[in-house]
Amino acid sequence: MILSPVTIWKKFDLTQALNAETEAETLTPAGFVAQNVRLDGHLLAGGGRVKIFARFTKPHGSEAAPALLLLPDADDDGAELADYFAAKGYATLIPDYCGRRGGKGTGKVTKSDTAANEADAAKEEEIAAEAEKIAAEENTDGGKRNYTVYPETADYANYEVSGAPAYLESESVENSAWMEWAYVALYALEYLKTRSDVSKIGVSGVRLGGEIAWMITLSPDISCAVIVNAAGWRSHLSAPKWGAASAAGEKSQDAGEEADAVRAFIAGVEAESYAPFVKCPVLMCCAMEDTFFDCDRAYDTFVRLGNPDGSGIVYSADSGKCIGPYALTDIDLFLERHLKGRHIYIPKPIELTVTESADGNLEMTAKTDEDALVKTLSVYYAEGRSGQVSSCRAWQRVKIVAGGEMKDNRFTCGCEPFSGAEYAFAYASAEFVNGFKTVSPVVGKRLKIKGGDCVKERVISAGEKDGFAVADYRAEALGGIFLEKESMPETIAGYGGITGVYSSAGIRTYRINSPRFVADDGAALKMDLYSKEDTSVKITVETSERGTGGEYSVIVPVAGGGKWKRMVLRAADLKDERTGGSLEDFSKGIAIVIRPENENCPVPVANVLWL
């Protein structure tokens, strides 16, 4: 049998009775009505059915409301997201697909040598904490468990057993976690269809939940899909799209060296395989610093969509691993069109070409949708090396123009690459007059001509927010994924009216990982800090591309009042948070993170540079 989304779908049996039970209505923290729902799911070959636990939340009002089948990430219960969408007028059903997640002393997330599972492993502590919370609720209602119960014969579907494997045994596709998770979502969809207080139905998934959402978008009962930080290609996370690692990965596939289990995963689970068969419009929201997926390949999945009309894609470059306020606006407009029937035009993505001239300079030309009115167009640029992880780029806006400055929906600008850079990257982003925002693919180009005019930069930041993103997003973000405007990096004034960059969630820059900004051997790090009262900040240099260790930190005091305080740090001043060892050299760094110890005491940062 040739494995594909079509053959997978032929295996789904949704004919079994739901036997749904709804419990007493309660109020959410935001005052919306919610109910626990229990229903029967997949009938296993050996007998016994999956017992699905879900949470239904509805907006105020007596009329039938459009609904979202909401699939959060594995470490989130979705409660905040349910309140967020209820306030927008949408009902939500959140089925638990994880089952047992693994609590303290029992967590067992399987790992492999793949980068996909390396990235997942970094979240184990968060998932274990959520598991403890769920475990505490298990027996609060007459012994009923507030999570999905998989029969013993389907123990592999429990997250504590499976993790999120980037492989699939083709001989036993029906006995896989991915198949069971999709079954949970599909039976939850069947339940939503039975409710008289629900009208149109969409699906939204975040990270792991987003990968599952791709698998069910083939259903004709789904009107639209919002996919967040999930674009497939997880089997390729160890092989970046541009560079030596990518070339090596492609060679091994051509030579037939890729394991059958990984081939099966690509064909039967990965979003890039499902996209051509999708029946509904899709909005892809991509946080460019999230290591769960490869943002470089997100557009590759988007262009494969079988139903592109009314679909869209948007990036968030400065909101860390979260979706920022521009993407939230896109989500609102997208759902209003496809679930509420409003006449909202969704512009087509931007076309972007990047060419290298004879003198080594770059020319970038962006072309927007001819049927949409552009408010502003921005072009972003970054430099890097071969095989670099896409989430570690220092994006910089090199040009912003008003729509009236464009001719025939086109705009061209130039850029002078740093002579030591191996690759140049660019993308364009446009905001339209109706509020919708869309982007181009990320274009990567190996630089062939080494110009000599560009010199290395000592100044990492003079105090502008360009190049900085939110560091610790989870405490600030709705559902750990939606970041609203007040948490974004901002410039605030200190002594003498001089401005610096600040966020209550801390700020991170990957500029020290860029060839243009990398530290010379033996360099010291200098920055100016300002505070109105005595406080302290934690300065961290991260040395791992995927955030799985290698954090060297120091806490420095900042005296309140007076002038800006100058801080100078040597590499040896920063200590490994696990071993206590000193940082060897700043040139080993991937990112600098600056966190306020007191989030109620703003500490702007300016004049970050190498000495």
Features from the language model and the residues they span:
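Short beta-strand element of the alpha/beta-hydrolase
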Residues: 53-54, 64-73
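N-terminal cap/lid segment of alpha/beta-hydrolase-fold proteins
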Residues: 15-62
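Short carbohydrate-recognition loop motifs
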Residues: 482-510
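Cap/lid segment of the alpha/beta-hydrolase catalytic domain
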Residues: 79, 84-87, 91-182, 232, ...
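Short beta-strand/loop motif that positions the catalytic acidic residue
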Residues: 278, 284-286
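Primarily recognizes the serine-hydrolase "nucleophile elbow" in alpha/beta-hydrolase
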Residues: 187-243
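Surface beta-strand/loop "capping" patches
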Residues: 337-381, 396-408
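Extracellular ligand-binding interfaces
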Residues: 100, 500-580, 595-604, 609-610
